[in-house]
Amino acid sequence: MFSGKECRLLSDPYFRLIRQTDNFYEIQSRNTGHFWIIQKNRASQRYPVTVYHKHTQDTPYYHRHGQSYTVSSALKQIESHDIYQINGRKAVCSVQIL
């Protein structure tokens, strides 16, 4: 289901390949060590690519992180997430304790 171009994108040195099937690639970011699944869905679905994420190998499950129209866009989501993690996560709100 993945085109030659998509396979080359997923083989980028930015990632470490964990597992590959016809329907998904399981990869690890070399920058953060986070694990990702890029899954190709049926063409009839609105978003043909779903992105799943987990922080460590020991975490028993992945959570859905996002969807995209292309594998390239999904990989940009991962790189954006890595930048967010590396630059330090900012609190959504702060509580002042008196």
Model feature map: region roles:
Residues 4-7, 53-98:
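Mixed-charge, Lys/Arg-enriched low-complexity segments
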Residues 33-63:
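Short aromatic-glycine-(Arg/Gly/Cys) micro-motifs in beta-strand/loop hairpins
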Residues 1-33, 58-60, 91-98:
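Negatively charged, low-complexity tracts enriched in Asp/Glu with abundant Ser/Thr
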